[in-house]
């Protein structure tokens, strides 16, 4: 009976579509509600009562615009709980509503002996006229000023009408007459007839509006009582449940918001309340399209990890033989060699749950968080077993314990202890396989590397020439590549490139082709991209005068001739005097294959090639420049390694001198470095290094002196064409001329140099024709200048002080 396949895991997004996060929306709405409640009131939108001061309300009260006798909307005075403040709630007529006015005569008789508080409030009137008698003489008869049918008023009634503004003021409206010990007031009572409430809310809203009049009881209480009458009742705010709930509403909203915030943050893997939760991400095969077909150049590493995939697919094949799958696989290699890509391919090929996490995700500022995340990660992996856990950059958490400035009680060490226990502790987690990647395996803790934890170490090296060719072919599938492109040639010229650098090379070639307007990527774009990735972009805009270009041409010609005349050197690929990166010129060679070993004779020829530029300057100019700084440095380093590391000195023998400069790791190297040889040995080392460099200089001088005519021809060719291929340089050395000279390549214009299409302007001038005439004149002038220059150049003399300072530095 065939074994049943493992249960496929449940990946995110494989089931029903996720429902929207209602908690987040509720939280947002609650926040908006609290802000609206705190910063906005109904009055802000014109929905609540209108606020008025006491003076304005008093004026409306006297004008009769305050509704007084409506039982549905009575005038109320509400005091605060402490009784120091109050608010008048009233209904008033809008300004556009005008009443119908009727006049009724009145008469008031009162004793002059009354106290002032009981006398009429004449000050509330706008004016009155005083006469001596309540009678007037008409046709010889005394006629009373009190009209017939006049309403008799008492003093309180008069005062009330005066406060309500219902006494018609003015000198002609009120007459005050003295009658013995009595005073008589005669005037008109104003009766305003307002439109009554209809009961229709829309109609009444157009007639009335509510107002609130705040006042202080201590200073304005008596005035309010006098205005509204002595029978005015003051009531305090009631502590009803509605008011209490209204006051508690902001607090309740804030608590609800905090609840949803903590719930939302604790629900995610990166929530603020989930410090101890694992940040491992479950990789879905629907989203991960990388397979082993996308991984090239590391065949041995693919075979090592393929066993994991095969075991997960068919475990009985291994169990029948008693074999167990490795508990952990550690992938070690330089940056960019494809360790993470290999892990993604495992995730794409296997049917098991695949968790991915970075080593830095375990370490936080809080104590115990890292260990808690390790335990939670393995708990998740056990629930979906069989499963794979990929830890990228494990050196962030797996450094050797007991070292460093933090001592032995570091938070990172607690995390590492938890990881060690989970991988191979008291409990058996055979269904959880850990895959880790690092480029610093030398600093990992030994307990992490022992069998039972990381049983297998897979070394992912830099690809060889065949591997680089395969990697280029993989990345070329993603772009439009022209037919006939030799990936083998590009692979030979990219020795030491990692997979990531090769991917970047193909992408740069695609960008160059797009910049040139090409439909396909040719080999020329790949080579140009290779040069750009290795040494930088061409700097044709660098301002170099004719003398500086000639110095560079002589220097590079010396390198090229020495490269071709030394038997153990690599084949010449290209010579250029176009500035690129930090160099003013460059001589490039193309290795036939990757060399795992280097002979002493090959190193000696490298020293000769390095000295070729300085020797050419000495031969042609009779002096030297500072342009050979990098050559001298590289030659000195190579010669010192030959003496101190490779044992290629007869006088010093097969002994390594000097401490090996490995990876700097503070937990293993806290002291200062010291030499392991004496001063006399140091002098002998220096003499041997000097001997190797001087011997190479003499060989280079002899080669260039013998080929002086070829040096001049190659220099002139570089001055004319700027860049020469290796075959063209070989033609010059063999035949004295090039059989297939290169075409003059015009570099593409910079974006800032792109001008508008020439044409005719408004004045009728033909700009295109004028531009062509200007270019022709300029070409003729340049030709005349070159002829004069050639006449002055024979014989050529050069003084380095003109171009460089006396100390050899570049002239500013």
Swiss-Prot record:
Enzyme class: hydrolase
Disordered as annotated region, ranges: 739-812
Annotated Zn(2+) binding sites: 555, 559, 631
Pfam families: AAA (PF00004), AAA_lid_3 (PF17862), Peptidase_M41 (PF01434)
Keyword Chaperone: no
Record topological domains on the Cytoplasmic side: 1-21, 263-812
Entry EC no(s): 3.4.24.-
Localisation: Cell membrane
Residue numbers binding ATP: 333-340
Known cofactor(s): Zn(2+)
Catalytic residues as annotated in Swiss-Prot or TrEMBL: 556
Compositionally biased residues, Basic and acidic residues: 757-785, 803-812
Topological relation to the membrane, as annotated: Multi-pass membrane protein
Transmembrane segments: 22-42, 242-262
Cofactor note (record): Binds 1 zinc ion per subunit.
GO cellular component: plasma membrane
Subunit structure as annotated in this protein's UniProt entry: Homohexamer.
Protein family (similarity comment): In the central section; belongs to the AAA ATPase family. In the C-terminal section; belongs to the peptidase M41 family.
Protein name per its UniProtKB record: ATP-dependent zinc metalloprotease FtsH
Highest classification ranks of the organism: Bacteria, Pseudomonadati, Verrucomicrobiota, Verrucomicrobiia, Verrucomicrobiales
Primary gene name: ftsH
